[in-house]
UniProtKB/Swiss-Prot annotation:
<protein>
    <recommendedName>
        <fullName>UPF0260 protein Ent638_2368</fullName>
    </recommendedName>
</protein>
<dbReference type="Pfam" id="PF03692">
    <property type="entry name" value="CxxCxxCC"/>
</dbReference>
<dbReference type="InterPro" id="IPR008228">
    <property type="entry name" value="UCP006173"/>
</dbReference>
<dbReference type="InterPro" id="IPR005358">
    <property type="entry name" value="Puta_zinc/iron-chelating_dom"/>
</dbReference>
<comment type="similarity">
    <text>Belongs to the UPF0260 family.</text>
</comment>
Length: 147
């Protein structure tokens, strides 16, 4: 008899920190800069990557110290999860909070990020370095459901 995976047997609140962190598929979509319209508060998504994002691997270069390097970096927690409506529809945190399952390409199911990159879920195919961008408004995207 096989053991039920933790994401099916526990609520987000019941997960350990290690389990919580492992839900992140590493797509890098959280690490793309967003712009907010000052009049409407509407959020616009760009393909401009945070300076700390390694675009090839879609990993933070300084994850443990990211807030020192990027004070505006977000920390997704169990408490603030409901406030991040902009999370991608493929995000495990969002899906589990909505009572849905993980997508078939998720690294917890496949054992690697290969399928996620192959499905073009990650930002590696669309992200540009912040240092190479002059006008962020030229890099506004629709919500990156599929990068």
């Amino acid at each position: 008899m096989s053991e039920i995976p933790f994401w099916q047997s526990k609520t987000l609140d019941e997960m350990t920190d290690v389990q919580w962190e492992s839900l992140c598929d590493g797509c890098g979509q959280c690490c793309l800069h967003k712009l907010m319209d000052e009049d409407s508060d509407e959020i616009y998504f760009t393909n401009v990557a945070c300076k700390q994002l390694n675009i090839k691997t879609c990993q933070c270069r300084n994850y443990e110290r990211r807030f020192e390097y990027e004070p505006d970096c977000i920390k997704l927690t169990r408490d603030n999860l409901p406030t991040f409506e902009w999370l991608p529809h493929t995000c495990a945190y969002r899906l589990l909070a909505e009572g849905k399952g993980l997508p078939t390409w998720h690294p917890l199911l496949t054992g690697s990020k290969v399928e996620m990159h192959g499905e073009r879920i990650s930002v590696r195919h669309i992200a540009v370095k912040e240092s190479e961008v002059q006008d962020w408004e030229d890099h506004i995207l629709n919500h990156p459901k599929r990068a």
